[in-house]
Amino acid sequence: MKKNRAFNQVKKTKFDGRIKTSAKHQLRNVKTGVKDGVFIYKGPLTVSEFASKTNIAVANIIKHFFLNGLALTVNSVLTNEQLADACVNFGFDFKMETEVTHENIVANIQFEDSDDLLQPRPPIVTIMGHVDHGKTSLLDTIRKTNVTAKEFGGITQKIGAYQVKNHQNKTITFIDTPGHEAFTLMRARGAKVTDIVVLVVAADDGIKKQTEEAISHAKSANTPIIVFINKMDKPTANPDLVIQQLNKFDLVPEAWGGKTIFVMGSALTGQGINELLDNILLLGEVEGYQANYNAHSSGYAIEVQTSKGLGPIANVIVKRGTLKLGDIVVLGPAYGRVRTMHDENGNSLKQATPSKPVQISGFDIMPVAGEKFIVFDDEKDAKLIANKFKEQQKQKANNLTVNQTLKEQIKNKEIKILNLIFKADSDGSLQAIKQAVENINVAKISLSIIHAAVGQISESDIMLAKASGALLFSLNLGLSQTVKNIASLQGVKLEVHYHIPKLAEEIENILKGQLDPVYEEIEIGKAEVLQLWFHSKIGNIAGTIVKSGKIKRGNLCKLFRDKEIIFEGRIDSLKNEKTPVNLIETGKNCGIVINGCNDIKIGDIIVAYEKQIVKDGKL
């Protein structure tokens, strides 16, 4: 990819890639509009936005594309190619400018450390696994074996991570926010913090849902895994069964001819703890984790909060360089000089070296967890970068959807592997879609199912999709509005499908670079919820009266409460009295079951609708 001038200037600065004053001008927003007969733009715009920037009537723009076989609305997004086509048609020259953003400045500052400047740093470890398998107990036991009772009881603040030493006095950093949600949230923001994942599995319980999720998340991040089989003190412990279960995830112990480190032990008794620490350090040496200790510092925020007396504070892990008191730090929308620095025991520090977790204060506003921090020489430059972050947060709602961006990338051959995540109502549905995906064959692009499980889509699934750039599909299960809102906020493409062949066809069309068909929602009928029943096998049954139109079994539907959408799904069952029916007309009472909907109340409105294809599109 061709780098713009601002990147070159950032890279050429003498000390650690700090930003020169001349680069400030490159950081200013490129203004979209017509200048001297040239339409300057930064990226895709809606028809309405293009019209307002060029003073061309919306109707004329829509007419132009309609005559060329493309039906658009005022809110349709014009691609870069379509904008160029419109400019030519309406008599403008055009020029696309690349805007320098907070993300690409932070991500692309190049640190060219020669090998002689690098020194080993402690490995950074996250513990993951199923709930109740002993993640927290393991962390506590490791912590207790490395501090005195007085120190352990006297911790003054929780900073999200801590360091321990093994019997050879070698250091390991543990992130003590166990769970794959925190792990993936960091990765979704581009943060490569964790070096090694310790996967905890209970010897008396085996592989569970969250175990599988944790494996998917770690493998998706290409993070090495060490398996700790916990609860070996239990009389029902069966480590061989656990090992057999893990084989299907390509986690095979070295003793069985594999490459994965397995440690047997007990967080309760302390069995295997020293062996685990030694193996973490051994793997760290093999992987060769290094950093330049003498450089300006950078790293990641694992937690942020407000402290009485200190204001906004951030719990950070240093990944490069040495962070010092008085350093000017940028962290997301916040910047400031490091005013105080403490370790996990509340000890005041003057500096922090690579892999060291510390709590720092001195920010002007609240930072953002998961973002990268960087030290700058010039406070004005720091303020400029922080302000850039704020501006982009405001503009986020106007950005391209993930789906359209994905298709642009596929068209431009920037994506060679498309990641997929499936959640389904049953294992049978999962097996069916897996088989369907295996049969999809598009030249030069491959499909990778990075996670598939039975159950509703969770926030964890959304964060994994964001972190891995995956498409997320729900099979035969509706979505709550909360989940949809989270997906929208994170920019994740999320779809519900009730027909596996159609889903497979859509995935194939995406790979071929086709746009989704343009659909129009046609309201079929509307019903008001008057009563509620609960059936142990069916779930919630809504007693309704059809207010308008007709309701059909199998209709897509939306559940409204106070004019807000609460749930979207499908009508699975209709009953008149106790008789199953396929259709209910206006004025009649009926019992309605909405697939996957658990939140329904008297007074809610159910709107049944159908989707009709208006027009197919192509990139």
Swiss-Prot record:
Where in the cell? Cytoplasm
Q: Where does GTP bind?
A: 129-136, 176-180, 230-233
Q: Which UniProt keywords apply?
A: Cytoplasm, GTP-binding, Initiation factor, Nucleotide-binding, Protein biosynthesis
According to the record, the residues making up region (G4) are 230-233
- The segments labelled G3 in the record are 176-179
Main localisation, per the record?
A: cytoplasm
Biological processes per GO annotation: translational initiation
Q: Which InterPro entries match?
A: EF-G-like_DII, IF2_II, P-loop_NTPase, Small_GTP-bd, T_Tr_GTP-bd_dom, TF_IF2_bacterial-like, TIF_IF2, TIF_IF2_dom3
GO CC terms of this entry: cytoplasm; cytosol
Provide the residue span(s) of the region labelled G5.
266-268
What GO molecular functions are on record for this protein? GTP binding; GTPase activity; translation initiation factor activity
* Spans annotated as G1: 129-136
Annotated tr-type G domain residues: 120-289
According to the record, the residues making up region (G2) are: 154-158
Matches recorded under SUPFAM superfamilies: Initiation factor IF2/eIF5b, domain 3, P-loop containing nucleoside triphosphate hydrolases, Translation proteins
Query: Which family, according to UniProt?
Result: Belongs to the TRAFAC class translation factor GTPase superfamily. Classic translation factor GTPase family. IF-2 subfamily.
The cross-references to NCBIfam families, in alphabetical order and at most eight, read: IF-2, small_GTP
HAMAP family recorded for this chain? IF_2_B
What is this protein for, i.e. what is its function? One of the essential components for the initiation of protein synthesis. Protects formylmethionyl-tRNA from spontaneous hydrolysis and promotes its binding to the 30S ribosomal subunits. Also involved in the hydrolysis of GTP during the formation of the 70S ribosomal complex.
Name of the protein in question: Translation initiation factor IF-2
- Organism in which the protein naturally occurs: Mycoplasma genitalium (strain ATCC 33530 / DSM 19775 / NCTC 10195 / G37)
Q: Which gene encodes it?
A: infB
